[in-house]
């Protein structure tokens, strides 16, 4: 029965111990039913004629004005999901109370009250109140901090609005929560769909709907109004839904639903109680908590049986066992975890690192492999157009002008290469090209083709398709080349020439993009991917992206911190190897994407662990490498900012992106860097390890202290004719000890504890308990002997003196263990605790010594200790600290120290 109760309780512990932002991406939405009325509404919107759409939403092609926006927002509310709305304070208070430890204490308190032990019930109630209120305060602070941090990296949408009283309109970038039904927005590759939308115009628009349907392949969307073949709105060509992402193409669409009224919003409301799979951090906390609770559930009955059998007073034995159970309950664990993580998140924000999910901090500190892209991480992210040449390597204005037309007229996601082409073309040429050539159509970029095309016209008779992209992908659709002004077949001789020229450019560290063209008769209708065939290779544009000055020292710092850096790039292996060499990273054997496709999972996992540089990768290659590294037991971080990085960001233990990343990358990430730099990342890793170290201190102290206390209680219960300490004493001792732990999140951490990755190790915790728990028992038994034979407190009439003596020793030794276990060094000499922790422990020790002498002593059934007791007290504490230090030295040499 007990096992079933606590199994249910513990199941909800991880989410209660850690404040997690209720992000919609975390919800499990597949196969969840929405109201029939919503399905009918969506199907109606899917086929509604455009003219009727304008009337339905009281909008117009020029966009909404400010008054219309405010009216729509008043009617429909903000574009936020219900889960994102703040809960009332009393809901937060209940959530902070509702953890297994507080529930357990409440049960014990109720038993005490029922047995008329009112003082014990009051002390237990006070402990629950302190734990709940401290946790509530820390949750409120962490929520406030998380909201402030999220506001720094909010996603935006491009919307068409009327911008002045004259009725002039323009495209504005606004936060997505400001969208209202009737807004017209632009979509491009990499965008998160910010609301439910009806497509008005689309060009090769492909959307990933896995968050709603579970289907991994993207689906094509279009502006057709034909009757849908299915009754499922998700299969309608004209509708896009909040929470999905644009994989490729462009579109304009009207917002038809926002917030809770969206398909995703309805699903989110119905799955808010569903349990998501706990991550490594939550599993670690859960295992530790379950271990401590099971330990208490086993030992409390044992104490009851021994005391009841030896003393004959089963009622008193039951009260004592109850107090032991309270003492073994680590009710401050939720508060310690929450406050430590929240403090870590705030400190990380000062290092330009924004934490989206608080429990990601532990994975940050545990990370031992960092996979990252090359561009903007190792390099300056300021790409410069260095060369524009024909296939022989001679400068060619024709190639530059073709590249300019492609970059200028494409409406998709303009990357740094496009910007470099536009900036690398002189203004006069740009004006001339813009006046002579008009855009007809475009075929947007996607990561399957790795190229994009625009169709332009200089006259009414012919169209010209201009295509640029990765060299191999362009060669795959070329049949001819322009060589010395003539069009010749693309044969083996030309291919060898092309390889020779491009390899030379790559070895110089230049990134090569191919440019090809095709002349076509003028025609009506859209151009498709099939038109990218029989192209003429015009030449290449080559870009320079020099390494950052901070990259080399950052890589050295990461290596010194025990983190292996691996480069996963879609770029050429020659360019990537050149950059690696310049920043002091030994690339060694380079693995390219085509090689990966021929390897089994086991072969690739083996290769991934010993390989530093992977080149010419697709998004799926990156995701597979990250997944296999995790399978081999590594804690893997992935840093990326592009659409192609999103799968790997989700697969990694910790996804890291930057503030300027595309929406889908920022949404997939756990950590957002305000500055795209490995040096900033290294500082964040150190702070993550510091945060984890402080959490681990409390867990180790609690586990070892509880383990030792139980041994002491069992020995005393078996051999003493009276209780070694009254239930009341145990409760007060536990309460004072809890107060001393409040400052642990603010403690200092030794340098050696942050020099290597830190991760949960349940085996180490069990070993730690066995080594350090019995130390306190040894000195507890010495105290028993001292009080029995030296002070002759060996009869029921003198038991108050005995209990007072052990009360003081127990409280002081339990408080001092904080300073002994917080460091592997010699405490107070080689390593000092932070001043808040020092102050709290000193106050608790003074209170503990003073209680037997205070007016409360008689009420607490304590008595003043003789002055001759205190030299013995000093000797016992000194011996305790000395032995602990000796055992600590042996333990750290043999097993290491977390």
UniProtKB/Swiss-Prot annotation:
Native source species: Escherichia coli (strain K12)
NCBIfam families associated with the record: ATPase-IIIB_Mg, ATPase_P-type, PRK15122.1
EC numbers on record: 7.2.2.14
Stimuli inducing this protein: Induced by low levels of proline and by osmotic shock. The leader of mgtA mRNA functions as a riboswitch, favoring transcription under low Mg(2+) conditions. Under limiting proline levels the MgtL peptide encoded within the mgtA leader cannot be translated, thereby favoring the transcription of the mgtA ORF. Induction by osmotic shock also depends on translational regulation by MgtL. Induced by low extracellular levels of Mg(2+) via the PhoQ/PhoP two-component regulatory system.
Side of membrane Cytoplasmic, spans: 1-94, 138-287, 336-695, 745-766, 819-831, 887-898
Stored InterPro entries: ATPase_P-typ_cation-transptr_C (IPR006068), ATPase_P-typ_cation-transptr_N (IPR004014), ATPase_P-typ_cyto_dom_N (IPR023299), ATPase_P-typ_P_site (IPR018303), ATPase_P-typ_TM_dom_sf (IPR023298), ATPase_P-typ_transduc_dom_A_sf (IPR008250), HAD-like_sf (IPR036412), HAD_sf (IPR023214)
One annotated GO molecular function: ATPase-coupled monoatomic cation transmembrane transporter activity
Record field: catalytic activity: Mg(2+)(out) + ATP + H2O = Mg(2+)(in) + ADP + phosphate + H(+)
Protein's name in the database: Magnesium-transporting ATPase, P-type 1
């Amino acid at each position: 029965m007990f096992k079933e109760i606590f199994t249910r309780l513990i199941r909800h512990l991880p989410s209660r111990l850690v404040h997690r932002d209720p992000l919609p991406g975390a919800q499990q939405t597949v196969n969840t039913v929405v109201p029939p009325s919503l399905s009918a509404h969506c199907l109606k919107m899917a086929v509604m004629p455009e003219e009727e759409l304008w009337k339905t939403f009281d909008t117009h092609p020029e966009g909404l004005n400010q008054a219309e926006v405010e009216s729509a927002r008043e009617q429909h509310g903000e574009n936020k999901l219900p889960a994102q709305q703040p809960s009332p304070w009393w809901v937060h208070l209940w959530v902070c109370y509702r953890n297994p430890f507080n529930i357990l204490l409440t049960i014990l308190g109720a038993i005490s009250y029922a047995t008329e032990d009112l003082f014990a019930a009051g002390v237990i109630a006070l402990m629950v109140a302190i734990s709940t209120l401290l946790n509530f305060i820390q949750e409120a602070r962490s929520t406030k901090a998380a909201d402030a941090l999220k506001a720094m990296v909010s996603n935006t949408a491009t919307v068409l609005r009327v911008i002045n009283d004259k009725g002039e309109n323009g495209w504005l970038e606004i936060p997505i929560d400001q969208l209202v039904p009737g807004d017209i927005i632009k979509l491009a590759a990499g965008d998160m769909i910010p609301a439910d939308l009806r497509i008005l115009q689309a060009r090769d628009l492909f959307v990933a709907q896995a968050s709603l349907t579970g289907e991994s392949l993207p689906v094509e969307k279009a502006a057709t109004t034909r009757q849908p073949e299915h009754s499922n709105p998700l299969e309608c060509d004209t509708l896009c839904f909040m929470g999905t992402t644009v994989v490729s193409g462009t579109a304009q669409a009207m917002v038809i639903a926002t917030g809770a009224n969206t398909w995703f919003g309805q699903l989110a409301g119905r799955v808010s109680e569903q349990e998501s799979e706990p991550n490594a951090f939550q599993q670690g906390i859960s295992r530790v908590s379950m271990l401590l609770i099971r330990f208490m559930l086993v030992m409390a009955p044992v104490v009851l049986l021994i005391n009841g059998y030896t003393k004959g007073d089963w009622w008193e034995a039951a009260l004592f066992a109850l107090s032991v159970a309270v003492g073994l309950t680590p009710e401050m664990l939720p508060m310690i975890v929450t406050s430590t993580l929240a403090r870590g998140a705030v400190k990380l924000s000062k290092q330009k690192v924004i934490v989206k999910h608080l429990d990601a901090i532990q994975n940050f500190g545990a990370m031992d492999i960092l996979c990252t892209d090359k561009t903007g991480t190792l390099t300056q992210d300021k790409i410069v157009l260095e060369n524009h040449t024909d296939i022989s390597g001679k400068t060619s204005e024709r190639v530059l002008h073709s590249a300019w037309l492609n970059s200028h007229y494409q409406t998709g996601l303009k990357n740094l290469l496009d910007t470099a082409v536009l900036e690398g073309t002189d203004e006069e040429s740009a004006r001339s090209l813009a006046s002579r050539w008009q855009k007809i159509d475009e075929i947007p970029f996607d990561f399957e083709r790795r190229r994009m095309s625009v169709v332009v016209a200089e006259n009414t008779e012919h169209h010209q398709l201009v295509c640029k992209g990765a060299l191999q992908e362009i060669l795959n659709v070329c049949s001819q080349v322009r060589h010395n002004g003539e069009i010749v077949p693309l044969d083996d001789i030309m291919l060898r020439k092309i390889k020779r020229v491009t390899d030379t450019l790559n070895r110089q560290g230049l990134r090569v993009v191919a440019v090809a063209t095709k002349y076509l008769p003028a025609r009506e209708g859209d151009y498709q991917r099939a038109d990218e065939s029989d192209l003429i290779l015009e030449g290449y544009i080559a870009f320079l992206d020099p390494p950052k000055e901070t990259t080399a020292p950052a890589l050295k710092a990461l290596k010194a911190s025990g983190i292996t850096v691996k480069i996963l790039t879609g770029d050429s292996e020659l360019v990537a190897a050149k950059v690696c060499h310049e920043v002091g990273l030994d690339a060694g054997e380079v693995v390219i994407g085509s090689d990966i496709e021929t390897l089994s999972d086991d072969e690739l996992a083996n290769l991934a662990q010993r390989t530093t540089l992977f080149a010419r990768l697709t998004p799926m290659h990156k995701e597979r490498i990250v997944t296999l590294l995790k399978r081999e037991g590594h804690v893997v971080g992935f840093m990326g900012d592009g659409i192609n990085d999103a799968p790997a960001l989700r697969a990694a233990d910790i996804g890291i992106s930057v503030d300027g990343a595309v929406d889908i990358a920022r949404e997939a990430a756990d950590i957002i860097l305000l500055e795209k730099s490995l040096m900033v990342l290294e500082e964040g890793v150190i702070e993550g390890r510091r945060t984890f170290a402080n959490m681990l201190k409390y867990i180790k102290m609690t586990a070892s202290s509880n383990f030792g206390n139980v041994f002491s209680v069992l020995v005393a219960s078996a051999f003493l004719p009276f209780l070694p300490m009254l239930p009341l004493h145990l409760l007060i001792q536990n309460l004072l000890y809890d107060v001393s732990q409040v400052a642990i999140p603010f403690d200092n951490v030794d340098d050696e504890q942050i020099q290597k990755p830190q991760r949960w190790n349940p085996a180490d915790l069990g070993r730690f308990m066995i080594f350090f728990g019995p130390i306190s028992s040894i000195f507890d038994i010495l105290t028993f002997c001292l009080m029995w034979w030296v002070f002759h407190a060996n009869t029921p009439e003198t038991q108050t003196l005995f209990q007072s003596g052990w009360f003081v020793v127990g409280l002081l030794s339990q408080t001092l263990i904080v300073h002994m276990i917080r460091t592997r060094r010699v405490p107070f000499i080689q390593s000092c605790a932070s001043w808040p922790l020092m102050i709290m422990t000193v106050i608790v020790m003074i209170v503990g010594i003073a209680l037997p002498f205070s007016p409360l002593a008689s009420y607490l059934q304590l008595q003043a200790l003789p002055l001759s007791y205190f030299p013995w007290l000093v000797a016992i504490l000194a011996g305790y600290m000395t032995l602990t230090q000796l055992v600590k030295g042996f333990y750290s040499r043999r097993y290491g120290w977390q």
